[in-house]
Regions:
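Active-site recognition of the HExxH zinc-binding catalytic motif
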Residues: 82-94, 101-102
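C-terminal capping/extension segments of zinc metalloprotease domains
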Residues: 29-75, 103-156
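Positively charged, aromatic-enriched nucleic acid-contacting surfaces
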Residues: 78
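Extracytoplasmic/secreted cell-surface and envelope-processing proteins
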Residues: 71-74, 91-95
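Conserved strand-to-helix beginnings and helix N-cap segments that scaffold or border functional pockets
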Residues: 29, 95-98
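Bacterial N-terminal signal peptides
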Residues: 13-23
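Bacterial N-terminal signal peptides that target proteins for export
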Residues: 3-15
């Protein structure tokens, strides 16, 4: 026999994940819209090769590595969201150019409600990284400066 207390317990158990998902979605600052909203996001660390996220242009797809996302979030909460938006920049611009995707993501976040939180986290994240240079990204400090400049330009 099911008692009212047991029924309420089951209801809470079933509704809790849904309420958590809705609360998480409400906190998200940037959401893909238009054609970008149809881009699949797949959680697959094999596809990311150990990176936070990567994108493919044909077909347009974003891959996330939940393990690396969690590591970035633990160290620099919010910076992981910049990586996510950055990958959509590649798809929106149909380019492999990392600087262009950085700038696109910075402009998008600068216009998003409370996007400055994610921008500040990403800028701090890159400023704290070792000064190793990459031909695709430049140094982490150059990347931080690029993100900041693009965000400031978008805010004008």
């Amino acid at each position: 026999m099911t008692t009212p207390a047991r029924s309420r317990g089951r209801c809470v158990t079933l509704l809790a994940p849904l309420l958590f998902a809705l609360a998480t979605a409400a906190e998200a600052q940037w959401v893909a819209t238009g054609a970008l909203a149809t881009v699949p996001v797949i959680r697959d660390c094999t596809e990311t090769g150990g990176d936070v996220a990567v994108s493919r242009l044909d077909p347009p797809t974003v891959y996330l590595c939940p393990h690396v996302v969690a590591l970035v979030r633990k160290k620099d909460p919010g910076a992981e969201h910049f990586y996510f938006v950055h990958e959509f920049g590649h798809i929106a611009l149909n380019t492999a150019d990392e600087a262009a995707a950085d700038c696109w993501a910075a402009r998008e976040l600068a216009q998003a409600r409370n996007g400055s939180r994610y921008l500040a986290a990403a800028i701090a994240h890159f400023r704290h990284r070792p000064a190793d240079s990459s031909p695709r990204y430049g140094t982490p400090n150059q990347r931080a400066e690029r993100i900041q400049t693009c965000a400031e330009d978008a805010a004008r």
